[in-house]
Amino acid sequence: MMTLCLLLTACGTTGGETEGAAEARMPYRNMTGCVMEAEVSCTQDGAVWEAALRCDYVPEGETTVEVLSPETIAGVKAVLTDGEAALMYEDQCLNAGTVSSQDISPMACLPQLMSALRDGWLLEENTEDWQETPCVRLTVDQTGAQDGKILSTLWLRQEDCVPLRGEIAVDGEIILTADFTSFSFYGTIQDQE
């Protein structure tokens, strides 16, 4: 009987949210939007791609991601709306096709991480330092439309739940990392620094 009670108690926490995780994710679930900058890197076929990106994220609205560096592509913007993406440079616009949850591009890294915080299924939660800063580390699952396993892991600073780092893994391989350099919710002046 005691074993059954222990098993039933454990069942409630698998994939569910503890109070700490729910508290950390609540500002993201309730936000009207946020602005962030991050150093994003992608490793593919042994080659590393890195860029500084600025993202103006609007849940269920128009999200804009702009390349800040490297200089050779600075100013290129991606506009993401309802699963569609368009690349823009100055006054030119090029349809970039559908953003598939299985085919995550570096330009979609920051919006994907915010979406994961808002809607992903919590798999792991713990406390962990990131570069000597106490953080809540959350790993959430957003299984793709074609059943691909997409896991997003975020390190949120404990004192204010601001993201410091994010990683996106597809089918067990980390494909994108983001080191946040600034972050603020709409209507606040709360930089990450």
Features from the language model and the residues they span:
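N-terminal leader/targeting segments and the immediate start of mature chains
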Residues: 4-62, 72, 187-193
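Flexible, processing/modification-adjacent segments and terminal tails
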Residues: 29-30, 38-42, 74, 87-145
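Extended beta-sheet lipid-handling architectures
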Residues: 35-38, 50, 78-82, 167-168, ...
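Preference for bulky hydrophobic residues occupying beta-strand positions
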Residues: 38-40, 55, 78, 87, ...
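Solvent-exposed loop/turn segments connecting transmembrane beta-strands
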Residues: 45-48, 70-74, 146-147, 173-175
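An acidic-aromatic
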Residues: 54-109, 176
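Gly/Pro-enriched, hydrophobic low-complexity segments
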Residues: 66, 124-193
